[in-house]
Structures are given as structure tokens and as C-alpha cells.
């Protein structure tokens, strides 16, 4: 079963996305801040990341740049 990380600061949107994905038989971990997401990446890499562009602690575009600059996460969709 695929693991998807949802990174979204709006709690309502995050919950809707999480429920929809779980109902489609995906494993889902959700985060409201980029810092939480980065800590989770240290433990396990997901198969897919759904990433909000505007987060309270970091811009989503900057997160993508950071992921692309590291060999372990370079090809992470």
C-alpha cells in the first residue's frame, strides 16, 4: 500500500484530503507545518507528497527545491 504525505496548514483541507486518500486505500500521514514534514522524512520516505504552496513556516516551492537538491528525495513525486 502506498504511503502519501499531506502537507497542508489548513486543518479542514488537510482532513478532507486525508479522508479521501484513506478511503481510496492509501496510507496517509498529514502535517500542518513544513518542520513536521521534514522530521517525518528522516524516518521514512513516502511514495508521494501532496504539498501546499503557502505554509506558515516555509514556502512550498522552497520545500520542493530543497527536496530536489538531496539525492534521497530528488525523485520524490
Task: Mark where each language-model region is.
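Active-site residues of response regulator receiver
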Residues: 52
Amino acid at each position: 500500500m502506498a504511503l502519501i504525505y499531506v502537507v497542508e496548514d489548513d486543518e479542514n483541507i488537510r482532513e478532507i484530503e486525508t479522508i479521501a486518500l484513506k478511503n481510496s486505500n492509501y496510507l496517509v500521514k498529514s502535517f500542518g507545518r513544513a518542520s513536521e514534514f521534514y522530521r517525518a522524512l528522516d524516518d521514512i520516505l513516502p511514495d508521494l507528497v501532496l504539498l501546499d504552496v503557502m505554509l506558515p513556516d516555509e514556502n512550498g516551492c522552497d520545500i520542493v527545491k530543497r527536496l530536489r537538491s538531496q539525492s534521497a528525495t530528488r525523485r520524490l513525486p
